[in-house]
């Protein structure tokens, strides 16, 4: 019996991103290397790396560059995690100062090996940046901490970040294949709890599209996020990092993203960033400013 495989969808022109280049890019790469830091820009093979680094913006990834989970979409290295480096927050703060940042974004790998999921280092990093650069805003993109409310309390109190982000990533039906080890309801609960802890802090979440989800499912997730008091939404195209990762089912057109952005605004999100190359920290400072005007 002859089995015919479905053809791989051709990559459309709207997903072309410029290759990393320029003085700012080279200077930032040297700085990250010298301070022994990691960025999700590099580790997750972000298509916007060149644009963002030339704008002197980057998303720092703390707690090492080895993740304890094996999500089917993610390019970050998987395996046994590294020891926690308690000097890392100070080095992140130094990098932010040398880059002249007024808005810093910090994320991490999953650290299911630690009781608090790494929340303590998020707290230390937030405090280190603010101490070194008074007035610098700090957004954090956190894992689900395996549903541990005490971990979220560590991140949000006593002084909350300027934005708390936790991505739901996809629709519930696809969780088993896309987010192994995660649960949709748990992510919603952590977003709701973060907002309860600091009602004035914008809460943010995002999804990747193109993994086989239906538009009706995406709209339902958006409604769920609003019901759990999420303020900022990001929607972007899933891009397959390698042949070992989940295949792209389809490319979502810019017009479809525009329609979802309008739907999100109608639902009451303070800001919706939607487009093929959008990632959770893409133009994060603009998203914060738009959300806090409401």
Give residue ranges: language-model regions.
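Auxiliary Fe-S-binding modules of radical SAM enzymes
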Residues: 1-59, 90, 94, 124-135, ...
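Active-site mouth loops of central-metabolism enzymes
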Residues: 62, 73-86, 139-148, 208-215, ...
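Active-site beta-loop-alpha junctions enriched in small/polar residues
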Residues: 77, 109-111, 141-145, 169-171, ...
């Amino acid at each position: 019996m002859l089995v015919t495989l479905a053809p791989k969808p051709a990559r459309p022109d709207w997903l072309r991103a410029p290759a990393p280049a320029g003085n700012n890019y080279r200077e930032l790469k040297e700085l990250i290397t010298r301070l022994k830091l990691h960025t999700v820009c590099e580790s997750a093979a972000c298509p916007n790396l060149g644009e963002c680094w030339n704008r002197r913006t980057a998303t720092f990834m703390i707690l090492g560059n080895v993740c304890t989970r094996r999500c089917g979409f993610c390019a970050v290295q998987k395996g046994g995690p590294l020891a926690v480096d308690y000097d890392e927050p100070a080095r992140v703060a130094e990098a932010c100062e040398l880059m002249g940042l007024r808005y810093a974004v910090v994320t991490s790998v999953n650290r299911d090996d630690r009781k608090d999921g790494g929340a303590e280092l998020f707290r230390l990093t937030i405090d280190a940046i603010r101490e070194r650069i008074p007035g610098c805003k700090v957004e954090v993109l956190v894992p689900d901490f395996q549903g541990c409310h005490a971990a979220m309390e560590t991140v949000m109190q006593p002084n909350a970040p300027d934005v708390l982000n936790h991505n739901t990533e996809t629709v519930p039906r696809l969780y088993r294949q896309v987010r192994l080890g995660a649960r949709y309801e748990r992510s919603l609960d952590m977003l709701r709890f973060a907002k309860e802890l600091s009602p004035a802090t914008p809460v943010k979440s995002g999804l990747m599209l193109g993994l086989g989800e239906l538009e009706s499912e995406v709209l339902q997730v958006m409604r769920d996020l609003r019901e759990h008091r999420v303020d900022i939404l990001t929607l972007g195209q899933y891009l397959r990092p390698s042949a070992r990762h989940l295949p792209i089912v389809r490319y979502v057109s810019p017009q479809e993203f525009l329609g979802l952005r309008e739907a999100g605004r109608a639902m009451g999100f303070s800001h919706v960033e939607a487009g093929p190359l959008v990632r959770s920290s893409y133009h994060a400072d603009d998203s914060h400013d738009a959300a806090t005007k409401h």
